[in-house]
A protein has these predicted regions:
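Conserved nucleotide-sensing/catalytic segment adjacent to the nucleotide-binding pocket
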Residues: 52, 61, 65-108
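Phosphate-binding P-loop
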Residues: 21-26
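Conserved lysine of the Walker
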Residues: 39
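Short phosphate-coordinating micro-motif centered on Lys-Gly-acidic
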Residues: 2, 87-139
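P-loop (Walker A) phosphate-binding loop of NTP-binding proteins
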Residues: 32-34
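Short hydrophobic/aromatic beta-strand immediately N-terminal to the Walker A/P-loop
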Residues: 28-30
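N-terminal pre-Walker A segment at the start of P-loop NTPase domains
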Residues: 1-18
C-alpha cells in the first residue's frame, strides 16, 4: 500500500492531480478521514487532473452529489456522504451512480452501506507534526 505526506493544501491538490492520471476513466476513489483532513482539497486536485476547474469543486455536503465536466470531456462525480446514515445512502442509488461513466470521488466513503469492488480507497489524516498523511487502504 502506498502513502504520501503533504505539507500544504497546494501539495495535497497536486497529489490529487497525479492520482487523477492513474485512475481509469470510470474509476472510483473512496476518501475517508476526519473533518478538515483534506478530502475536498484532494478532490479538487483530481478535478484539475481531469481538466476541470478545481475551484468548481466544493464540499457538496449540502447537495450530496455534484457532477463536473471538463473542457476535454472529463467527467467527475463528487459525492459527500457526511450527513447521511447508511439507510439514506442506500436510497440515493449510489450503486448505479458508481457503476456509471466518469471518475467518481466519494467523501466519507466509510458511510457506504456496500463494498465497491475495484475502487481505490484513501484515508486522510492530519499529522501532529503538521501536514497530512494520505494512505492507500484495502477496499
Amino acid at each position: 500500500m502506498r502513502s504520501w505526506i503533504t505539507h500544504s493544501e497546494a501539495e495535497t491538490r497536486a497529489l490529487g492531480a497525479v492520482l487523477a492520471r492513474e485512475l481509469a476513466p470510470d474509476g472510483v476513489l473512496l476518501l475517508s478521514g476526519d473533518l478538515g483532513a483534506g478530502k475536498t482539497v484532494l478532490a479538487q486536485g483530481i478535478a484539475e487532473g481531469l481538466g476541470i476547474d478545481p475551484d468548481e469543486v466544493q464540499s457538496p455536503t449540502f447537495s450530496l452529489i455534484r457532477e463536473h465536466r471538463g473542457t476535454g470531456g472529463g467527467r467527475l462525480v463528487h459525492a459527500d456522504l457526511y450527513r447521511l446514515d447508511p439507510e439514506e445512502t442506500a436510497a440515493l442509488g449510489l450503486e448505479e451512480l458508481l457503476a456509471g461513466p466518469g471518475v467518481k470521488v466519494v467523501e466519507w466513503a466509510e458511510r457506504l452501506p456496500f463494498p465497491v469492488p475495484g475502487a481505490t480507497a484513501l484515508r486522510l489524516a492530519r499529522r501532529s507534526a503538521g501536514g497530512r498523511e494520505i494512505r492507500e487502504e484495502t477496499n
